[in-house]
């Protein structure tokens, strides 16, 4: 914090040098989030039926998500110089272990026998999961923000406002039951997470404009919303 306040140029340079590890860690965590959603035999609604049916069928293969993510980490690290590839592999493994650690902690807390304690501990597990998810999204935003300003405090304020807005909208959608009204909206969100993970991986060795990163999510959400509206109209007619 002292360096960020006293020497923002140096701090920004250090952050930019760490972009490989940030991309690997955040991309791995987000990819595990997306794959865990799609590779689930309890999932009964498909947006892209052919792809999602095949992914759901893979749920019987134990640890398939981990294998896919490890394969992606190794594949993307092959595009990097040797010293950066080692950093990418280490950070990717750290992101994978972090996700598994949060998942294990959530299962341990949810297995409590005492109902009241289970609610409190389950809330803690969900809180930790959301914090890690939010951090993974923010990693990409921090690097992009240095193109606009070197002031860490302005970056923190901007990311904080964005996170608060997104969480407020999410809570509103849950309370209004919007996800149940729009059949494919959740799918659009997880496809956005999956593509963001791939973009973060790719950013480790090539430049991808921030506008592309933002538009990918917006387009997928809008497409899923459109598909949901079409489905609702067809369902009402029948």
Regions found by a protein language model. Give the residues of each.
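Multi-pass alpha-helical transmembrane bundle typical of ion/small-solute transporters
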Residues: 1-238
């Amino acid at each position: 914090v002292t360096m960020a306040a006293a020497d923002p140029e140096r701090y920004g340079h250090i952050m930019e040098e760490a972009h490989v590890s940030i991309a690997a860690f955040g991309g791995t965590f987000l990819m595990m989030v997306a794959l865990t959603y799609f590779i689930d035999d309890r999932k009964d609604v498909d947006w892209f039926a052919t792809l999602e049916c095949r992914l759901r069928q893979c749920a019987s293969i134990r640890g398939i998500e981990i294998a896919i993510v490890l394969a992606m980490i190794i594949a993307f690290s092959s595009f990097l110089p040797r010293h950066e590839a080692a950093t990418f592999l280490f950070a990717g493994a750290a992101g994978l272990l972090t996700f598994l650690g949060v998942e294990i902690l959530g299962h341990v807390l949810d297995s409590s026998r005492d109902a009241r304690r289970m609610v409190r501990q389950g809330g803690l597990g969900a809180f930790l999961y959301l914090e890690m998810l939010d951090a993974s999204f923010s990693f990409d935003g921090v690097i992009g923000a240095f193109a606009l300003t070197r002031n860490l405090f302005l970056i923190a304020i901007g990311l904080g406002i964005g996170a608060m807005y997104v969480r407020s909208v999410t809570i509103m959608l849950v309370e209004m039951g919007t996800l149940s009204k729009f059949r494919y909206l959740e799918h659009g969100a997880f496809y956005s997470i999956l593509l963001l993970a791939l973009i973060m991986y790719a950013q480790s060795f090539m430049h991808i404009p921030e506008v592309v990163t933002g538009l990918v999510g917006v387009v997928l959400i809008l497409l899923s919303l459109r598909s949901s509206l079409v489905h609702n109209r067809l369902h009402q007619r029948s």
